Swiss-Prot record:
Residues 200-313 are annotated as: Disordered. GO terms for biological process: antiviral innate immune response; ubiquitin-dependent protein catabolic process. Residues 206-221, 240-253, 270-293 have a biased composition (Low complexity). GO terms for cellular component: cytoplasm; cytosol. The gene is UBL7. This is Ubiquitin-like protein 7. Keywords: Antiviral defense, Immunity, Innate immunity, Phosphoprotein, Ubl conjugation pathway. GO terms for molecular function: polyubiquitin modification-dependent protein binding; protein-macromolecule adaptor activity. Residues 18-98 form the Ubiquitin-like domain.
Length: 380
């Protein structure tokens, strides 16, 4: 076979419906060597050059052949790759770009810090609600997700996890220091204020905390609102809303400085997760009812039913409800549900269907994540 006939078929693992690409190996690079002399790292470079739009960097892909992940320092001969063989390209998880903290409106932040500082020192129930939220790992993780730049600020993370430090840094007198040095911490503290204000009563109806518009307490970073978290404030009855409040679009906390032309930006998945994680009253019982006890009234939505009963909306409860809903609708077996992904894994040389099913189940059917789990030896 002449050198011009040396070619490989390349297929993206996460795009099973995309036709294979034919990669012809350059004759000038072969010299005295055959196709088998190519290293896997050099093959990655050729593939990145061939599929520039899909594979911009050879360091961000793995190659799969006959169910094996190819090592960069090995050759094609080592893996028995022949002309015409199909090599699957598995794109690694893209590195997340560094998130910059959202800008802070110092005037608005000062007003909100005063509200929080007053509430912390005048209401034991409010103070306990704040510290209960911050001591809950799940809630803290979701606050981190909802606050750009917070995860890369170790000082801010330390403050949120220490009651004494939080009380000190929530002082309005600290704002001049925090805004330039730790803007993400300012945004996180404002987030805590609005989260807890929706689920715990603020001290004193005549205090400065009541002088602010009620809608500002329900606003959350990310454009969603913490409405319906308290039995006292919102019962999902439109007639309890005044005309101005119902006709005026809500805005985000002014301290976060977001001003999109079309109003608040759409809710993202991470923000929705934050809302669900924090949508529980601090004083509510830890008892989680079964989905069968939810929503006895046909005129009441599941969310409002859970809210009015004061029951925390936890991830476990949400998962249980989803599972029961799937079972009620006749959820197909895992094998039939993920048959396309199973066949794709078989095409890549992974013949252990049981292993593949476990990996797919653990990753929710994500073929790329399942492959990474299988090759990492982490399939359950």
């Amino acid at each position: 076979m002449s050198l011009s006939d040396w070619h490989l078929a390349v297929k993206l693992a996460d795009q099973p419906l995309t036709p294979k690409s034919i990669l012809r190996l350059p004759e000038t690079e072969l010299g005295e060597y055959s196709l088998g002399g190519y290293s896997i790292s050099f093959l990655k470079q050729l593939i990145a050059g061939k599929l520039q739009e899909s594979v911009p960097d050879p360091e961000l892909i793995d190659l799969i052949y006959c169910g094996r992940k190819l090592k960069d320092d090995q050759t094609l001969d080592f893996y028995g790759i022949q002309p015409g063989s199909t090599v699957h390209v598995l794109r690694k998880s893209w590195p997340e770009p560094d998130q910059k903290p959202e800008p802070v409106d110092k005037v608005a932040a000062m007003r909100e810090f005063r509200v929080l500082h007053t509430a912390l020192h005048s209401s034991s129930s409010y103070r306990e609600a704040v510290f209960k939220m911050l001591s809950n790992k799940e809630s803290l993780d979701q606050i981190i997700v909802a606050t750009p730049g917070l995860s890369s600020d170790p000082i801010a993370l330390g403050v949120l996890q220490d009651k004494d430090l939080f009380s000190v840094f929530a002082d309005p007198n600290m704002l001049d220091t925090l805004v330039p040095a730790h803007p993400a911490l300012v945004n996180a503290i404002v987030l805590v204020l609005h989260s807890v204000a929706g689920s715990a009563p603020m001290p004193g109806t005549d205090s400065s905390s009541r002088s602010m518009p009620s809608s500002s307490y329900r606003d959350m970073p990310g454009g969603f609102l913490f409405e319906g978290l308290s039995d006292d404030e919102d019962d999902f009855h439109p007639n309890t809303r005044s005309t101005p409040s119902s006709s005026t679009p809500s805005s985000r906390p002014a301290s976060l400085g977001y001003s999109g032309a079309a109003g608040p930006r759409p809710i993202t998945q991470s923000e929705l997760a934050t809302a669900l994680a924090l949508a529980s009253t601090p004083e509510s019982s830890s008892h989680t009812p079964t989905p069968g006890t939810q929503g006895h009234s046909s005129g009441t939505s599941p969310m409002s039913s859970g809210v009015q009963s004061g029951t925390p909306i936890t991830n476990d409860l949400f998962s249980q409800a989803l599972q029961h809903a799937l079972q009620a609708s006749g959820q197909p077996s895992l094998q039939s549900q993920w048959q396309p992904q199973l066949q794709q894994l078989r095409d890549m040389g992974i013949q252990d269907d049981e292993l593949s099913l476990r990996a797919l189940q653990a990753t929710g059917g994500d073929i790329q994540a399942a492959l990474e789990l299988i090759f990492a030896g982490g399939a359950p």
